[in-house]
């Protein structure tokens, strides 16, 4: 069985498929239908412990616990709910680390924003997640749990998933792809409703489409690439790791992903007051991304207390959007959610660490 492992060698079942659980149950000396029962309790009912799965023989449940086998659920240590019902969870792992997950509701959908690592090594200057560096990557069950925890907290089934929380997904790509498989097959979330965001990892992005097809059978999730600048020089000022990934090479790799998958690429662009938000920046960005199927998603900067960046005023944001639109670039402006509850990536975790 291709299972995930908790720190210390304990085994977590969350992330395993129905077929894997059936095979594992048989190997445990149980009938195959016990695996199907486990699957239902893991994913449909969201069980947090073997004690809750009363359909399983008590002797087997006790044996699993004694051998250190777990469901793999995380512990909620903090919850913040904004006036618009955006919900941020701070979840604790078994080794005492904390990660953030956000549920963003609208009338029609519930989008959940997931973390892929504890902290982040990319050190983007405007992002709270990278301030403390990287502690470790998350296991598959720790990624999947975030969806279950938000479903439980918000009493609503998630419809869309974005890997835009803590961490760089492409630096934990095997666990991320395994989680996508689980979310798709075991939780019924279509790949087309899943987005993987990256600032660009030169040894992984060029082969992402092929790797996804090998692991998932197809590559239908959306790739979102965080540009945040219209040229290499400014991008390196904002994203230190960009020095290893030339702008044109990054765009070529995005074109390759489009060619292989047929899925348009989304370009994320965070607007920083008086730094990358002027009309000339919009014109240069339009020249860069025009010519292949893509979409630009503008994001107004969410202030971090100890940084000197500013959030642009609404008029500047609209002027930037209008320049792109006039030049034939598909563009949208992401609405900021949860500003009153530190729901920007990494902020609640930093606040918890400072007070706790």
Swiss-Prot record:
Signal peptide: none annotated. This is Probable dual-specificity RNA methyltransferase RlmN. Residues 106-340 form the Radical SAM core domain. Disulfide bonds join 113-345. Pfam families: Radical_SAM (PF04055), RlmN_N (PF21016). It is found in: Cytoplasm. It comes from Prochlorococcus marinus (strain MIT 9313). It comes from the Bacteria. Binds 1 [4Fe-4S] cluster. The cluster is coordinated with 3 cysteines and an exchangeable S-adenosyl-L-methionine. Its main location: cytoplasm. [4Fe-4S] cluster binds at residues 120, 124, 127. Keywords: 4Fe-4S, Cytoplasm, Disulfide bond, Iron, Iron-sulfur, Metal-binding, Methyltransferase, rRNA processing, S-adenosyl-L-methionine, Transferase, tRNA processing.
């Amino acid at each position: 069985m291709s299972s995930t492992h908790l720190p210390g060698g304990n085994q977590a079942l969350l992330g395993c498929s129905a077929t894997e659980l059936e095979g594992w149950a048989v190997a445990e000396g149980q009938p195959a239908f016990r695996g199907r029962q486990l699957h239902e309790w893991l994913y449909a009912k969201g069980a947090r412990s073997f004690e809750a799965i009363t359909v399983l023989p008590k002797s087997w449940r006790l044996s699993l616990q004694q051998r250190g086998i777990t469901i793999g659920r995380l512990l909620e240590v903090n919850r913040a709910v904004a006036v618009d019902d955006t919900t941020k969870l701070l979840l604790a792992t078994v080794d005492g680390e904390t990660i953030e997950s956000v549920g963003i509701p609208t009338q029609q959908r519930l989008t959940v924003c997931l973390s892929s690592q504890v902290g982040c090594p990319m050190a983007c200057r405007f992002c709270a997640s990278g301030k403390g560096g990287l502690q470790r990557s998350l296991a598959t069950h720790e990624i999947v749990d975030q969806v279950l925890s938000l479903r439980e907290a918000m009493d609503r089934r998630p419809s869309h998933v974005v890997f835009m929380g803590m961490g760089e997904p492409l630096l934990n790509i095997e666990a991320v792809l395994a989680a996508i498989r689980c979310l798709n097959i075991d939780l019924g979330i279509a790949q087309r409703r899943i987005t993987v965001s990256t600032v660009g990892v030169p040894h992984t992005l060029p082969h992402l489409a092929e790797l996804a097809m090998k692991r998932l059978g197809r590559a239908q999730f959306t790739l979102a690439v965080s540009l945040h600048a219209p040229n290499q020089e400014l991008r390196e000022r904002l994203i230190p790791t960009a020095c290893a990934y030339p702008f044109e090479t990054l765009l070529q790799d995005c074109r390759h992903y489009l060619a292989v998958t047929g899925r348009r690429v989304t370009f994320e662009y965070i607007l920083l007051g008086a730094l990358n938000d002027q009309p000339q920046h919009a014109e240069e960005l339009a020249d860069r991304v025009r010519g292949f199927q893509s979409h630009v998603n503008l994001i107004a900067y969410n202030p971090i207390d100890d940084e000197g960046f500013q959030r642009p005023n609404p008029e500047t944001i609209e002027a930037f959007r209008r320049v792109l639109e006039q030049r034939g670039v598909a563009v949208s402006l992401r609405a900021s959610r949860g500003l009153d509850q530190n729901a920007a990536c990494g902020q609640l975790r930093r606040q918890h660490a400072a007070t706790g």
